[in-house]
Amino acid sequence: MYGGDEVSAIVIDVGSYSCKAGYAGDDTPKAVFPSVVGSIEQTGETDEAKADKEAEAASDSKNGAKPMDVDKAKTKRKLYVGQELEFRRDHMEVISPMKDGTVTDWDIVDNIWNHAFRQRLLINPEEHPMLIAEPSTNTGQQREKAAELMFEKYKVPALFLAKNAVLTSFASGRATSLVVDSGGGSTVVAAVHDGYVLQKSVATSPIGGEFLTDCMMKSLESKGVVIRPRYSFKKKEVGPGEYKVVDLDLPNTTESYKLYCMRAIASDIKESVCRVPDTAFDEVAYANVPTTSYELPDGQTIEVGADRFKIPDILFNPSLSQTIPGVDGFADSMSVRGLPRMVIDSVNRCDVDIRKELLSSILLSGGSSSILQLKERLEKEVLEESSGNTRVKVLASGNSVERRFSVWIGGSILASLGSFQQMWFSKAEYEEHGVSYIQRKCP
């Protein structure tokens, strides 16, 4: 088997916001990059591209090479992954492989994995066992698809799929806990008992960091703040130390790329100024709250007031989002629950004997869990909603890096344990039993 010393496993976690990859045994992932990709459809060819192609074909026929198969090129799209996204390109759409926490486009995931292995970690995947973190809500079909890609395309020697909630639990040294994972695309609450997710306890909500960022953006827009994406202007020096912002005219920029760049700025505003209010947000009470200033990339300074408290409070009270102009409400807003309700519902779906233990170790993880005061407020509200004399303890790592990467860190710990080495689903087993065997090897 894969003894710990001679070959290190790779741990990879593709979330809806970012992809984390690195070596098992490390304390943080080596590569972290966005999980969205830029895509340019290469069908409608521009005249320039056509001329280039014709010239190429002519030179190829001189050199005796065959011209490229045109049919193949008709539907091709070129994907830009990782740092390539930072550069604006004409007609580049930004697309995500995930919808509601599950993968919908495997081609993009494949490109993300490939980028992580070949460009960031600089490894040959054929030489390393892979531990892949998967959502607690993953279906059997999704798992088989991931396993098939890994064995058939990357020819990995061994594979293990571990659930996000279990890994978060391991990251804080527990085998039983209630994991509240608030990531970019969604928030998932799941009970973990003795290292297994109790599927009946899993509760999900579409409110994650990206939704809060959108609320922040729409709220600022409604107050007349214009967020200029970084690519859309340049600063021109008009005097010593004085700059004038000049807008650049880039008509072929897609809406999705513009939105992606504006979200990046709104997200930074959210991370810089927001904190969860101690009690439920109330427009009147927070009307005169002191503002915090934030400087946008183009130099204008904005003042953020009540929104600092209102935006994070959407996690606790989703209906608040409907008071922000321009935010699309959820199709069924009644079914979207706040965090404390999700926690109580999840615990109540578990066996009576373990409820006490779950409530006394509620773990926070995911990027959105780093909002200030979230831990204290959640503890207070769950305590109010739970019955009488239960002890409620919300645990969260003191530093936000550990909260953000807790799934990856749990994977790093798990894959480097000596006792874990017999758990791998090996290539030999895959060839003997087929892909469906993953359901038995990785419960």
Swiss-Prot record:
One of its GO terms (molecular function) is chromatin binding. Its main location: nucleus. PANTHER family: ACTIN. It is found in: Nucleus; Cytoplasm. Residues 47-56 have a biased composition (Basic and acidic residues). Belongs to the actin family. ARP4 subfamily. GO terms for cellular component: cytoplasm; NuA4 histone acetyltransferase complex; SWI/SNF complex. Keywords: Chromatin regulator, Cytoplasm, Developmental protein, Nucleus. Residues 36-69 are annotated as: Disordered. This is Actin-related protein 4. InterPro entries: Actin (IPR004000), ATPase_NBD (IPR043129).
